[in-house]
């Protein structure tokens, strides 16, 4: 199995009579982070298919995904939970409304993974590294 980078594009996975569109966009962030993502381009040709969007910055969900698309699941990261979480509190919540875990709105969902690494400071306090396994099941 090889890797396929999805820069503002998608690939469709077929299994039996079912299909899932894996959609990937380049970074789509709030300033000072760049916005190179082109969601309409990436979604073109996915009508009527269950969509999983890979978008690095979770702010993309409220800014464009919820109001302008029918993406059912967005997978994101970026926040690292600010590498700090004590008893469920992280300062990340002041910058990112969705900063860790699963969020739902209507028939759309966002999962934010806090990642494995760190930014600037080589440590984590309470915001332990994670690898997430998501199992999609037919309704």
Task: Describe each region flagged by the PLM.
Residues 1-139:
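Soluble catalytic domains of enzymes that build or remodel membrane lipids, polysaccharides, and related
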């Amino acid at each position: 199995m090889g890797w396929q980078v999805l820069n503002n594009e998608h690939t469709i996975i077929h299994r039996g009579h079912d299909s899932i569109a894996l959609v990937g966009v380049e970074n789509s962030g709030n300033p000072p982070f760049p916005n190179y993502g082109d969601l309409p381009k990436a979604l073109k040709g996915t009508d009527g298919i269950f969509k999983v969007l890979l978008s690095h910055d979770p702010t993309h969900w409220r800014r464009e995904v919820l109001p302008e698309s029918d993406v059912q699941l967005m997978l994101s990261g970026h926040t690292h939970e600010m590498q700090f979480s004590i008893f469920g509190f992280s300062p990340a919540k002041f910058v990112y409304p969705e900063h860790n875990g699963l969020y739902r709105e209507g028939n759309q969902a966002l999962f934010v993974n806090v990642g494995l690494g760190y930014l600037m400071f080589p440590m984590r306090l309470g915001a332990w590294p994670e690898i997430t396994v998501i199992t999609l099941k037919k309704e």
